[in-house]
């Protein structure tokens, strides 16, 4: 795949997601869920004006671009102006709420003083593998790119004027495709539409539909023809209007913080609203699994891929869901996804596809398991729904059983458990953050038992069992706290350290303070640690990197997650001014559409790597809520 890493814009519904560059090029298209399956290797579009060569719509020296979402929606508009021919193009991309098809609507306006003959060309290639070869097929004025499992269909309500199934690349660049073949064994093919003459000041419109027939549900050609003909007859304007209404209503319904009624900066509102609009696109409709983000690197040229569900990430994100009253999505994550992915021994593996299947892993992280229990009680604190606790009690008890064995192994130095990776999946061993999550899980389980007893059908034996379990949890929680004080505080550095092997300063040292509350934010050792964090992790631009020497992705870029974590700490410690400074840093680093990245480019102060990371957006909403609770904005 010709990897393009930055998904500047995303559109979709519950089934389909598509991502775009800032110039409007579609670079990915998923059907089924946000993480699987991706179908498009590339999808190029261009125009031929009079006798010119192709003007590649999204990368031409004479083209200028602007892009925006229709306010408070997932309807994306890209404006393209070609200064040589003086053609203005408005491209609108959206997925209807009620139809599983991507709609690309174009308006071409001739701002020249002469007539212009325009042709519109599409050149696309679908992903394939050695066991599932692909072909191109033009039938019923439709380009059907297919293999055994799926077909990607490009069509319009206009007739195709020319086509080329094999060897189309060079001819496409010349803007002149053609060939006798209507079918061929090629993963890339091209079609064109003749828009004919456009007079000065006139406009012409063209609608392109991209329909994915996954698993060849319409396996007979006549069935597929019928479905395409049905889609062609759809009222595109009505579908767009309905999508706009749906998303605006969605934002209103989930504006639990009342942000849009407050006198706040437009950037804060944009990030907040974009978070609300992004979240439902990344949740699996059936399981509740939450994708970390739209994929950026299918070929793993720079990373191990992102579009999976990490249980720990999901816990942070569901807390943000609760901030914007997405309670149903939170409960589906725990009631369905977490139950179906828990191993028999009570643990959760490192990461999963959002449909619940195990994803590629390279170890396990003990905090994944502990975080789920913490998250379940965090959700209960918001809803006070004891049935939710009851429904998940067995799952929590299984996880606690695993964690107790892990802690016993750690304290007794038995060495029976495989070493756990840390929060960042890089260091294998015993880390302060990971152990603190177990403290948080035990503390949460004690509270779960206290709340759920009234709705359980229990006899004296069960009552005594719970009482004994609570006593064990209290004892182990205290032992964990003492262990952490004795193990992870370095007297030479006068600071907590992330582990005993490299003794580095790490932003995850904040975890035992916020949100896990093992230590007070004003404890002397904690304050010493904060001083050390500020000396080692704060960048010259004012953000924070994850840990000493963090050079992931080629540079010491600050992370919104790390910077917002510092804001969390300062809010707890009562240093509101520093909290607001950290919050402002992240606010100012957002993309023009309101997306937050995994990292921030120090020079450009824009998102760097994984634009629209759900964890970043979750931390932003959680921090914003805390700031508003203190009346700081």
What does each model-identified segment do?
Residues 277-286, 325-348, 392-414, 474-494, ...:
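Long, well-ordered core segments of solenoidal/helical folds
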Residues 210, 252-266, 277-281, 315-327, ...:
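Well-ordered alpha-helical scaffold segments within catalytic/enzyme domains
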Residues 184-187, 203-226, 292-308, 349-371, ...:
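The feature captures the catalytic groove of carbohydrate-active enzymes
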Residues 1-44, 306, 317, 352-354, ...:
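C-terminal capping/lid segments that line or modulate ligand- or cofactor-binding pockets
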Residues 1, 83-103, 107-305, 387:
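Acidic/polar, glycine-enriched structural segments that form the non-catalytic walls/loops
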Residues 1-83, 146-171, 243-265:
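An extended acidic
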Residues 154-164, 431-437, 468-561:
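Extended ligand-binding clefts on enzyme/binding-domain cores
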Residues 109-110, 306-410, 435, 439, ...:
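Aromatic-rich carbohydrate-recognition surfaces in CAZymes
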């Amino acid at each position: 795949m010709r990897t393009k890493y930055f998904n500047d814009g995303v559109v979709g519904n519950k089934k389909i997601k598509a991502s775009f560059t800032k110039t409007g090029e579609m670079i990915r298209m998923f059907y089924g869920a946000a993480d699987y399956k991706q179908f498009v290797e590339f999808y190029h579009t261009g125009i031929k004006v009079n006798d010119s060569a192709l003007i590649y719509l999204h990368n031409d020296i004479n083209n200028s671009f602007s892009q925006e979402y229709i306010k408070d929606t997932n309807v994306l508009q890209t404006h393209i102006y070609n200064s040589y021919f003086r053609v203005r193009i408005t491209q609108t991309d959206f997925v209807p709420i009620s139809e599983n098809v991507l709609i690309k609507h174009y308006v071409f306006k001739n701002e020249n003083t002469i007539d212009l003959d325009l042709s519109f060309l599409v050149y696309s290639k679908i992903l394939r593998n050695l066991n599932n070869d692909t072909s191109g097929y033009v039938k019923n004025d439709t380009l059907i790119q297919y293999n055994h499992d799926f077909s990607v269909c490009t069509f319009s309500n206009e007739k195709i004027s020319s086509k080329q199934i094999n060897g189309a690349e060079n001819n496409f660049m010349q803007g002149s495709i053609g060939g006798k073949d209507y079918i061929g064994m090629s993963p890339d093919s091209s079609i064109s539409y003749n828009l004919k003459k456009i007079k000065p000041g006139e406009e012409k419109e063209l609608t392109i539909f991209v329909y994915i027939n996954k698993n060849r549900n319409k396996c007979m050609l006549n069935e597929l023809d019928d479905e395409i003909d049905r889609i062609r007859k759809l009222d595109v304007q009505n579908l767009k209007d309905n999508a706009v209404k749906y998303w605006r209503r969605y934002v209103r319904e989930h504006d639990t913080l009342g942000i849009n009624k407050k006198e706040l900066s437009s950037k804060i509102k944009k990030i907040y609203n974009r978070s609300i609009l992004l979240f439902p696109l990344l949740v699996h409709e059936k399981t509740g699994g939450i994708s970390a983000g739209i994929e950026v690197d299918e070929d793993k040229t720079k990373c191990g891929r992102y579009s999976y569900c990490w249980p720990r990430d999901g816990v942070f994100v569901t807390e943000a869901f609760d901030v914007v009253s997405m309670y149903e999505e939170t409960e589906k994550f725990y009631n369905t996804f977490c139950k179906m992915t828990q191993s028999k021994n009570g643990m959760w593996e490192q990461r999963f596809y959002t449909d619940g299947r195990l994803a590629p892993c390279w170890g396990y992280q003990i905090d994944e398991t502990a975080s789920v229990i913490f998250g379940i009680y965090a959700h209960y604190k918001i809803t006070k729904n004891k049935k939710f606790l009851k429904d998940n009690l067995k799952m929590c008890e299984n996880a606690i059983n695993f964690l107790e064995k892990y802690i016993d192994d750690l304290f007794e130095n038995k060495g029976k458990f495989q070493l756990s990776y840390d929060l960042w999946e890089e260091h294998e061993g015993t880390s302060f953050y990971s152990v603190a999550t177990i403290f948080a899980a035990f503390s949460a389980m004690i509270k779960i038992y206290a709340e759920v007893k009234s709705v359980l059908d229990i006899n004296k034996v069960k009552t005594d069992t719970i009482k004994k379990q609570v006593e064990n949890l209290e004892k182990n929680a205290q032992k964990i706290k003492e262990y952490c004080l004795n193990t992870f505080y370095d007297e030479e550095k006068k600071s907590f350290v992330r582990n005993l092997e490299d003794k580095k300063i790490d932003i995850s040292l904040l975890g035992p303070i916020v949100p896990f509350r093992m230590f007070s934010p004003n404890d002397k050792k904690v304050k010493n640690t904060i001083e050390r964090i500020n000396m080692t992790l704060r960048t010259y631009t004012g953000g924070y990197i994850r840990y000493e020497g963090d050079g992931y992705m080629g540079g010491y870029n600050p992370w919104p997650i790390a910077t917002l974590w510092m804001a969390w700490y300062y809010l707890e410690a009562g240093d509101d001014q520093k909290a607001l400074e950290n919050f402002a840093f992240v606010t100012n680093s957002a993309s023009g559409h309101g997306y937050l990245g995994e990292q921030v480019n120090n020079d450009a102060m824009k998102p760097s790597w994984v634009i629209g990371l759900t964890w970043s957006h979750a931390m932003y909403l959680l921090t914003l809520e805390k700031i508003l609770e203190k009346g700081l904005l």
